[in-house]
Amino acid sequence: MEKGPVSQFITHHYRHFNAAALIDAAKGYEAHIDAGGKMMITLGGAMSTAELGISLAEMIRRDKVQIITCTGANLEEDIMNLVAHSHYKRVPHYRDLTPQDEWNLLENHMNRVTDTCIPEEEAFRRLQGHIFKIWKDADDKGERYLPYEFMYKLLRSGELEQYYEIDPKNSWMLAACEKNIPIIVPGWEDSTMGNIFTSYVIKGELKASTVKGGIETMIFLTEWYRANSGGKGVGFFQIAGGISGDFPICVVPMMYQDLEWEDTPCWAYFCQISDSTTSYGSYSGAVPNEKITWGKLPPDTPKFIVESDATIVAPLIFAYVLGW
């Protein structure tokens, strides 16, 4: 495949240091997929609010990723951007805000993520009304699902289409739903929808067990990895740090150490994009080789780390893999 202008630009200019690491990681990703391998992408930080979906959705459609792990915030915020985009407010001078300015944003029901404010009413509450019906229907029937399965039900219901404010092709959740790829969401409770669900449980309107939790999520991931790690194996492309990376990478040592499935393949490719620097006790900032000692990566797995802003780096790597 002949590369497009973005790929040609970074290949020509990104020759050394962190820039070269970006190219190496992109070429490694492409080689793994071209050889028949599969890829997990993990999303930490505020990648959905950063509108990574513009490139990630195409990665999903083009079969460059087979499974995603993300925080509960990233699961919901892509859909929030889909239905409330025009109500978001950008605050480019956010560093100059006083505590009173921040309070005024709250009073206006705007929740800030760096330079972007998410509108409570149009984003959170708009989803709440529709997702509650889906939770309640499952609860009444005694059915139980993982967090992403409920979100897929919401998207497939068509209830949100009346609110769409961006081109649907730029929503990675819609692309994932159309492909029906699994999404691992560890710690879903730490999200707006997780908090809202909890409030209904406290009020006695829903049962906590209706949404499957962390142990069942790990079991689901174990079954998926067992079924998909043959051949060229599964790669691990980690965007930012935190639980979205920490949780899924542990499935490998759990399978061969705790389950004693000694034929379990290790991750076949590893890349992390993070601005968390190496420091004493920092897991997110640890170099990939540290993971060898935990049985997550073998010595011969291609390993890359790009220490930079993921909102800049990830779209460039995706562009290279897509041939843009």
Where are these regions (language model features)?
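Short acidic, glycine/serine/threonine-rich loops at helix termini
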Residues: E51-I54, I79-H85, N195-S199, P248-V252, ...
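Short gly/pro/ser/thr-enriched loop/turn and capping motifs at secondary-structure boundaries
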Residues: N74-D78, S191-T192, T277-Y280
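Ligand-binding beta-strand-loop-alpha-helix segment within the catalytic cores
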Residues: D101-T192
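Glycine-rich anion-binding loop/nest that anchors nucleotide
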Residues: M39-S48, I68, I184-W188, A208-Y283
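N-terminal glycine-rich anion-binding loop in soluble enzyme alpha/beta folds
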Residues: M1-A26, E30-I33
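C-terminal functional extensions of proteins
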Residues: V6, F17-A20, G233, I243, ...
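A generic, well-ordered mixed alpha/beta core segment in the N-terminal half of proteins
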Residues: A57-L127
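Glycine-rich phosphate/diphosphate-binding loops that line cofactor/substrate pockets in enzymes
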Residues: A25-M39, A175-K179, E223-G233
